[in-house]
Each structure stands twice: as C-alpha cells, then as structure tokens.
Regions:
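Short, high-confidence coil segments that cap the C-terminus of an alpha-helix
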Residues: 76, 131-134
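Active-site/acyl-donor-binding loops of N-acyltransferases
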Residues: 83, 134-173
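Conserved acetyl-CoA-binding loop-helix of GNAT-fold acetyltransferases
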Residues: 113-126
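A conserved beta-strand-loop-helix scaffold within acyl/acetyltransferase catalytic domains
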Residues: 1-114
Length: 173
C-alpha cells in the first residue's frame, strides 16, 4: 500500500474511533451463526443494488451452508464492525494455508457512511490477518477501486475442467 493510501486508511480509522464507539469481532462457535449470517446478508444487500440482486433466497441458503461448514472446519472469518453498538460493516472471508481470502462484503450506506465503515472494517481485517500470520490477503475476483487502494494487484485466474473419458471394456485391456 502506498504511503498516501496508508495515511488515508489510518485517518479513516482514527476518525471512526474518535467519533464513535468502535467494535470489531470475528464470528466464532460462541455466536449464533444463523443470526450472524442474516446480519451479513442485510448489510451485503444494503451496500449496492447489484449485491442485493445477487443475494437471492437460494444464494442466502448457500451462504448459510458455506458459513456453517467453514466455521466448523475453522476457516470462516466473518467479521463485523460495530459503531455505537450497531453493526455497520461486514466481511465474509476465509483463512486457509496462511491466506486470507475475502469473498464478499457489505455495509450500511445510510448509517455512519461519513465514518467509512467498510474501509475501517477492511483495515481491521487486514490487521487481524497480519497478526494471524497470513502471508497473503486476497481480494479475489472483481476490480472495485477500493481493492487497489488497499494494495490489490491483478493476477490471472484460470479455470480447468478435468473429466474422465469414457473407456469401453475392450479398450481397458
């Protein structure tokens, strides 16, 4: 992250901490996962119209199932930023093999937008990843501007499909 952007990120963090009671937490086994995923969905849908369109009832069920599986495996990193006790931003991510993989995010643009809750939550998540020993913070797909402000770099994403060819019994000999 360039020096100017580091300064801007720290400035946003300090402003939030000065103007509100800031909380940050990662969802764990002690939390009600279903309720936390519901809160993630509310914030994710509120953040942008295309995200609201993406989060169909079927996709909501998918996120719930993935969250349960990944939490039980120890990989889920569902974070929330609270401002004055109200959930203001969230990240749905995974930590695996010393990599922090950001899958989706959201924030409430109508509440505390002047405090940049999405940026602040992201900065706390990056700080967590560093403290946890992650060597890579992967923003994954998408070219949203904020990713580049946090130092994201493009890389090729390749898809490979492997299938087993049908072999007749005569060919197996």
């Amino acid at each position: 992250v360039e020096k100017k952007q580091r300064h801007e990120i720290r400035r946003k963090q300090r402003r939030a901490e000065r103007e509100a009671e800031v909380g940050f937490y990662l969802v764990g086994q002690e939390h009600n996962l279903e309720a936390e995923v519901d809160d993630f969905v509310v914030l994710q849908r509120a953040s942008r119209e295309d995200k609201a369109d993406f989060m169909t009832p079927q996709m909501r069920r998918f996120f719930g199932a993935v969250a349960r599986t990944m939490l039980d495996a120890g990989y889920l990193r569902l974070s929330f930023l609270t401002l004055n006790g109200q959930k203001a931003a969230t990240l749905f991510a995974f930590e695996y093999d010393r990599k922090f993989l950001l899958y989706n995010s959201g924030y409430d643009p109508d509440a505390y937008s002047h405090l940049s809750p999405g940026w602040v939550n992201l900065s706390y998540s990056i700080q967590y990843a560093i403290a946890a020993g992650c060597r890579l913070f992967d923003f994954m797909q998408g070219d949203e501007e904020y990713k580049y402000r946090f130092g994201s770099q493009d890389y090729k994403v390749m898809r490979t499909i492997v299938s087993r060819a049908e072999v007749s019994p005569a060919e197996e000999r």
